[in-house]
UniProtKB/Swiss-Prot annotation:
Biological processes annotated in GO: translational termination
Main location: cytoplasm
Name used for this protein in its record: Ribosome-recycling factor
HAMAP family noted in UniProt: RRF (MF_00040)
Gene Ontology MF term list: ribosomal large subunit binding
Domain of life: Bacteria
Organism, as annotated: Synechococcus elongatus (strain ATCC 33912 / PCC 7942 / FACHB-805) (Anacystis nidulans R2)
Subcellular localization(s) per the UniProt record: Cytoplasm
Pfam families: RRF
Protein family: Belongs to the RRF family.
Protein role: Responsible for the release of ribosomes from messenger RNA at the termination of protein biosynthesis. May increase the efficiency of translation by recycling ribosomes from one round of translation to another.
Amino acid sequence: MKLADVESTMQKSVEATLRSFNTIRTGRANASLLDKIVVDYYGSETPLKSLASISTPDASTLQIQPFDRSSMGAIEKAISLSDIGLTPNNDGQIIRLNIPPLTSDRRKELVKLAAKYAEEGKVAIRNVRRDAIDSIRKLEKSGEISEDDARDQQDQVQKLTDKFSAKVEQLLSDKEKDIMTV
């Protein structure tokens, strides 16, 4: 496993963690809250963002304007059945989602959820490290690289692991501040 591949895979783990963070609701409206919602549209599971334009007219409202008005009911149903905890208001042309302010208990729950996502990201990074070090050891055992080269490569992999784990920690810290800001 090349060092560039290790770095690329670790970067993807950080990006996946960031995508998970974006699904956590803060006190402000954010279109990424709806990223994971899929709508049963004429019998096929379709992502909401491919059926409608999503905008944020103000800090506490999400506005969904379907490209096809006949999909309004299906979109409304998908939002109601999702776990985002918002009730859609349909006026026949636009669906609005009002984002209520978060209670302090809910904020604490969301911080715990963010910490869980961060831990999952760090576990993924450590798994990449483990795989890389295993492949370095195999190369060393087979005699393809020397013991010194193996140690150097393992040190480089560890430095990458530390770097990307710190990135995840920074993302978590930023998300916690975002969630706890009233």
